[in-house]
Amino acid sequence: MKRTKLLLSLSLLLWVHPLVAAPQGANATEIVTIDAKATAKPFPHFWEEMFGSGRATLTLRDSYRRDMRAVKEITGFQYVRFHDILDDSAGVYSEDKDGNPIYNFSYVDQIYDGLLANGVRPYVELSFMPSKLAATPIVHQPFWYQPIVSPPKDWARWDDLIRHFAQHLIDRYGIEEVSHWYFEVWNEPNIDFWAGDPKQPTYYELYDHTARTLKEVSPRLRVGGPSTAQAAWVDSFIQHDVENKVPVDFISTHVYGNDTAANVFGTNEDIPRDRMVCRAAKKVHDEVLASARPQLPVIFSEYNASYANEPDVTDSIFMGPWLADTIRQCDGLVKMLSYWTFSDVFDEQGVIKKPFYGGFGLVAEGGVPKPSYNAFRLLHMLGTQRIPVNSDSVLATRRADGSLVLVVWNYSAPEQPGTPKEISLQFDGLKGKKHATIYSLDADHGNALAAYAAMGSPVDPTQKQYEELKAAANLPAPEVVRSLAGGKITLTLPAKALKLVVIR
């Protein structure tokens, strides 16, 4: 997880509606007209189908499963991805005194049993290399737990490991279940998570062996890659698979909001954090469409606003507008966006020393929901049909019952204080008396980070302080507007605020 955007064509990112007036000045009210009867398009909730979560053995912790259930409750997510299912910490592979392979799937069973018992399926990242199978003991130094990133010493033994692993899963869970899983080959082989030399051809060798072996076990197993950082290698990867008749069922890659244009696009430009993810998604989307396999689904199996520890980003209310705008822009470009990660039960940089250190998770140390958790809670309430508007601060949807659900935000970069913003929503085509329910996430509502700062940012909060933080994280009861006068409602949004409006 580390990473980099081309301006997305507005014609692909926005449905332009002719009835929306743009603000006329810096402090002018933005008027957005929503046609309640407008033709809508399907709007799958691609941002909440899957989440990332550190490494495999963390799933055995009570705190991990607690946070997983909390996020499952507000999003209904179906898949979880993590590193290290083949690493020594999971105990899958060893050798006897004569060098013969020994397989042990005890931890694998406990890990996957725990996911399935909570209604979550594995998105299996096949990594990292067992020490006894590694060609050289090269480790990924930045990670506290030091995973081995070497190619295997023997390709036949790697194939045998993959074969035994896949067959065990089918024997335990049944092919009807496992055929719904995804198998992704490795993690970010284009950077220092892969020590093959040269990187690309040796990764393709790894992919070829793995994909073919999985399909030998069952053609119903879904396999894909290249799982690269910075949205890299996609066109080359597809070309390689087609030319060499290697199976591939999906494309996976990663990008982060603070990746650089040089790394993602090879250009010398400054791409802002709120544009990077979806410009990268557009790049990959177009590469797949132009390939010999244009129907391959695209999965960004890692993304976030930052790959660094930035409390003012991932712990803050900034994430509400950033997430909403990312969803607006990426709609139609991907099958899934997998947020890295759902929880700060996470140890890539070592054991967590304090809550709110800029971790990636939606839930902070101690089970405290962050503003990003509340943003996902609100975004889950959106409908499954998208109605066109031309505002870049509004996303309008319709539910199956005919109610309208809109999310409205006031974005500013994390390093900028931002200013309040007024948006007037004007509805055409509403029939009968309607009322609005308005949910708010901002500096004063649902913001545990502010409460943490107010108590002096303790390194080791007491249990009482943790309870106070959880209370501060709760979203307040929504405001109810009993009647929409003239079919419109005007919202004042503080800096970095997010509001969700339900019209019934």
Which role does the model predict for each range below?
Residues M1-L8:
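Bacterial N-terminal signal peptides that target proteins for export
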Residues L8-P18:
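Bacterial N-terminal signal peptides
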Residues W186-N187, H254, S301, W340:
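Alpha/beta-hydrolase-fold catalytic nucleophile elbow
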Residues P189-P201, G225-P226, A232, F237-D241, ...:
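Substrate-binding/catalytic cleft of secreted carbohydrate-active enzymes
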